[in-house]
Every structure is written in structure tokens, then in C-alpha cells.
Amino acid sequence: MNNQDLINDKSKNGLTYAKAGVNIDMGNAMVEKIKPFIRATKRAGTDAEIGGFGGLFDLKAAGFTDPILVAANDGVGTKLKIAIEVGIHDTIGIDLVAMCVNDLLVQGAEPLFFLDYFATGKLDPEQGAAIVSGIAKGCQQAGAALIGGETAEMPDMYAKGDYDLAGFAVGAAERSALLPSKDLTEGDIILGLSSSGIHSNGFSLVRRIIQQSDLKWNDHAPFNPQMNLGTALLTPTRIYVKSLLPIIKSYKGIKALAHITGGGFLENIPRVLPSSLCAEINLSAIHVPSIFSWIAKQGKIEKIEMLRTFNCGVGMIIIVAQHEVEKVTQELKMQGETVTLLGKLTKRQNKGITFKGALHL
């Protein structure tokens, strides 16, 4: 039997993979749609072409001499549910990339490449292409190449229209430039970089508040009447790589970073500190965006719970030696970041973080 015979040998009554719910042709159609997005992420070290069994990256071509590889993977939690219900799919991929590459940045690493996992019950090529376009935008913002991924069509695993996303990022740092630095000391200054909003944590709580308030996704956002609620909540997570990475490389006084994600201030800042030091944060210095004030008021959420769940307007923490604070602050502002002096490192007594002042919600 030759190839043509195989193609023509179709039993009208026989089962096929497509009849079982997996349409390979739809998957191939989606691949063709996303190729231009992926090519746009090309960078030194890779051609950002897909189709092979694995993606390749040349560390030497990327300019590293003694690199340490750094890996991170993450998802976007139940922010996905809002994207699905609102029908906006071209920004959630930015969140996916942000959650991974911002974690790489905390180690002092430059994001090199990214891979995604997209799973759904029934593949919609248009929806899938929109999602990947967002992932590609995030990769461009981070300077990372999108070198591969997996699209899984799994009948009966997901409700109609639902999907899930996961991302995996790899970066590199020169061995001598890894963060956090070992010379963190009392008196080092804590700076905060503003977030773009909720980012990608705490959405199960946000969704519960919205359910109790009877608001609809197309209603005006109570905290931002110029936008509808769904669009406002889907504001993408800020990616700090291009503004912060050159400064990390230029100033040895930058000793540590902390990405304020799940666990908020309470969990994430102590993670980068030695057991002898404590972060003293002045809550009065934080400019809390109206979205968090609305969440706290609507849900009757205590301030400590807000600080443990949300970024409260601060998406990235930087710990800097006193003598370089002014220069680092100026550089960050020139890169378009909003910088706040939040506190300093002190000798640890019991906890890895203490607060003074009041959080103005």
C-alpha cells in the first residue's frame, strides 16, 4: 500500500483521533498563525524558529563567559478565569512571561528563552493564536526568545472554552554577578518599584469579592471609571527586565531584589535576606493604587492580609548600598520606573520583616 492508498483508505464508520476530540489539523493551523509572533522574539543565541523536537540556545553567542543558568516556571492563577469570561486572550500571555522572567531577574539573571504550555479541551486556533501573541509580546519586553512550547488538546479535561497556561523561562548570569549578594548589611536601603496593578496574584480573592458585589465584567470599574471592570483587572503584569537589568550590571551596590508575588511583602522580602537581617518597611511611604483600596474596602480585608496577598502597588523590591541609592534611583527613574524609598535593613530580632507607619488604603 503506497502513501496515496493510505490517504484514501478512510472508513466512514471508523473512529479517528478527530472524532475522539483531538484535531491535528486545527493544531497545525494554529502553528502557522503563531509563527510570525515567535519569529519576532529572535535574539542573539537562537533563531526563534519552532518545529523541531527541542529548542536550541547558544550561550557563547549570547556573550556569556562563565555563566550560571537560572530557571523559573509559573502560571497566572485564576486571572485566567477572568480572561476566559471577558474574552480577552491577547494579554494573559504577558502575565505568564512576567511571572517567570521577573523571578529570573531577582537572581541577577538575563532572561534568554521561554517555553509555554497551553492546554484546552477543544482547540480554537484564533484563541490560541491570541494567547501566543501575548506570550510573544511578553518575551519581547523581556528580551527572551520564545523557542518552543506545547499545545495540548484534551477532550473532557476542561469545561467548554476553558484553558490553562504554564510557562518556563531560562536565564543566565555571570557567576560573579548572581544575586542576592553575600554582603547584605544593616543600613542597606530598600527601594520599591511600582506595579501596574494586581499583577497575577490574589485573583481568587478578587473574584470572590466581585461575585459578592454583583458587578459584571462590562460594568465601569469602581476604582477606574474610564475602563470596564474586566479590562482593568486584566492589566498585564509589569516586566522589569529591560529597565532594571542594565542597572544591576552597572551598580555593584545593588545587593538583592524581591519579586512581590504570592505571599506579598511578608513572604517575599525575607526570602532574599540572611537569617541575621530584617527588612524594616515604612508603610506610610507606599502610594497604594485605588484598585487595592477598593478591594480592601469591598472585602473588608485587614491590612495585614492585604500585605500578605497583594503587592499593594509595589511589584519589585531593590536593596541597595547606601552610597549608591541616589544614583540607582536616578537611573531607574530615567528608565521610566516609579521609585519609592521604603525602608532599610536592620538586625533581626524575631521576624524577617517589620513594619512602621500605616498603610493608607
Curated annotation (Swiss-Prot):
EC category: ligase
Residues that span the membrane, as ranges: none
Subcellular location: Cytoplasm
Keyword vocabulary terms for this entry: ATP-binding, Cytoplasm, Ligase, Nucleotide-binding, Purine biosynthesis
Catalysed reactions, semicolon-separated: 2-formamido-N(1)-(5-O-phospho-beta-D-ribosyl)acetamidine + ATP = 5-amino-1-(5-phospho-beta-D-ribosyl)imidazole + ADP + phosphate + H(+)
Listed pathway(s): Purine metabolism; IMP biosynthesis via de novo pathway; 5-amino-1-(5-phospho-D-ribosyl)imidazole from N(2)-formyl-N(1)-(5-phospho-D-ribosyl)glycinamide: step 2/2
The EC number(s) this enzyme carries: 6.3.3.1
Molecular functions (GO terms): ATP binding; phosphoribosylamine-glycine ligase activity; phosphoribosylformylglycinamidine cyclo-ligase activity
Pfam families assigned to the protein according to its UniProt record, in alphabetical order: AIRS (PF00586), AIRS_C (PF02769)
Matches recorded under SUPFAM superfamilies: PurM C-terminal domain-like (SSF56042), PurM N-terminal domain-like (SSF55326)
GO cellular component annotations of the record: cytosol
Primary subcellular site in the record, as a coarse category: cytoplasm
Keyword Metal-binding: no
GO biological process, one term: 'de novo' IMP biosynthetic process
Family: Belongs to the AIR synthase family.
PANTHER family: TRIFUNCTIONAL PURINE BIOSYNTHETIC PROTEIN ADENOSINE-3, TRIFUNCTIONAL PURINE BIOSYNTHETIC PROTEIN ADENOSINE-3-RELATED
Xref: NCBIfam families: purM
The name this protein goes by in its record: Phosphoribosylformylglycinamidine cyclo-ligase
Gene that produces this protein: purM
